[in-house]
């Protein structure tokens, strides 16, 4: 990897770190090392990074702000591209905004609310990046990204980059085309908003923030929701009904506040979290004959 690191630095693509612990880059504070972590300084820098990756034929992975993510203890081989400060541009034109994939969803929602632009109220308090939100069709309070996305600039698994329309994104509940059909990540997005009364937008945002603060354990290291809701049921309710709130394996613990959250109670490993996830799946299956599926992305090791 020395030649890869050297060329990435020569091309001045952004920050380049060798053998970087990914626990430093996830909201759960868990994860082994990346062979190389690159934080690109722009979309053009991403293109340069991909040129180097193709030249040396190395594996690559993209992460955002580290929420909704569990990195395995073995870490990630090859190059990890972290969409962060270099991809947090914001351009507003009327009721339409073009925003970088590394931009904070919370920061974007707050900024737009102050301008009286409606459409992202549901995102108040949601951790993570715009790119990640598009990738998983993040949502809350009956709304999601599919309702406001016009198009997205996508870096595909084969290294090509192109724009996809809302229809081409093939959104459904907490999924998009990027997860399986056409694996890729969102570098930037164009969102359609609507001008409304600023005060009512701000009030709704605050209400959503308060709800999250009072019902979800974001003061503790966690990844966000662990399981998708097996509709019409709610994952958190099933976990609570099964008596699993507070259940702990190693340093990983099911939150006392919300059954669909696993917190790092101190020194948790990814294995602790995986074992706890398996225990929940097995228990819910035995008690209610319902299969639970993870919402959190699990990456690293041989995955």
Curated annotation (Swiss-Prot):
Its main location: cytoplasm. The active site is at 174, 225 (proton donor), 295. It is found in: Cytoplasm. It comes from the Bacteria. Its cofactor is FAD. One of its GO terms (biological process) is cell division. Pathway: Cell wall biogenesis; peptidoglycan biosynthesis. One of its GO terms (molecular function) is UDP-N-acetylmuramate dehydrogenase activity. Keywords: Cell cycle, Cell division, Cell shape, Cell wall biogenesis/degradation, Cytoplasm, FAD, Flavoprotein, NADP, Oxidoreductase, Peptidoglycan synthesis. Residues 29-196 form the FAD-binding PCMH-type domain. One of its GO terms (cellular component) is cytosol. Pfam families: FAD_binding_4, MurB_C. Its EC number is 1.3.1.98. It catalyses: UDP-N-acetyl-alpha-D-muramate + NADP(+) = UDP-N-acetyl-3-O-(1-carboxyvinyl)-alpha-D-glucosamine + NADPH + H(+). Belongs to the MurB family. Cell wall formation. This is UDP-N-acetylenolpyruvoylglucosamine reductase. It comes from Bacillus subtilis (strain 168). The lineage of its organism: Bacteria, Bacillati, Bacillota, Bacilli, Bacillales. The gene is murB.
């Amino acid at each position: 990897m020395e030649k890869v690191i050297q060329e990435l630095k020569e091309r001045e693509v952004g920050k380049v770190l060798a053998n970087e612990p990914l626990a430093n880059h996830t909201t759960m504070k868990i994860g082994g090392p990346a062979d190389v972590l690159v934080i690109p300084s722009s979309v053009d820098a991403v293109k340069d990074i991909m040129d180097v990756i193709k030249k040396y034929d190395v594996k690559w992975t993209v992460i955002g702000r580290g929420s909704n993510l569990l990195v395995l203890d073995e870490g990630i081989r090859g190059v990890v591209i972290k969409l962060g400060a270099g991809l947090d541009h914001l351009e507003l034109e009327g009721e339409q905004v073009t925003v970088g994939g590394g931009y904070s969803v919370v920061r974007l929602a707050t900024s737009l609310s102050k301008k009286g632009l409606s459409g992202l109220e549901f995102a108040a308090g949601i951790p993570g990046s715009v790119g990640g939100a598009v990738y998983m069709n993040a949502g809350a309070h009956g709304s999601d990204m599919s309702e406001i996305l016009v198009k997205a600039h996508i870096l595909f698994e084969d290294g090509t980059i192109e724009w996809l329309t809302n229809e081409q994104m093939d959104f459904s509940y907490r999924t998009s085309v990027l997860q399986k059909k056409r694996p890729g990540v969102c570098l930037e997005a164009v969102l359609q908003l609507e001008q409304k009364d600023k005060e009512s937008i701000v009030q709704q945002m605050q209400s959503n923030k308060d709800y999250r603060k009072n019902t979800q354990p974001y003061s503790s290291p966690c990844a966000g929701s662990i399981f998708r809701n097996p509709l019409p049921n709610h994952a958190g309710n099933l976990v609570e009904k099964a008596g699993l709130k507070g259940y702990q394996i190693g340093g990983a613990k099911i939150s006392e506040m919300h059954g669909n959250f696993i917190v790092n109670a101190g020194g948790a490993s990814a294995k602790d979290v995986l074992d706890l996830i398996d225990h929940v799946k097995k228990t819910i299956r035995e008690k209610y004959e319902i299969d639970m599926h993870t919402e959190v992305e699990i990456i690293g090791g041989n995955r």
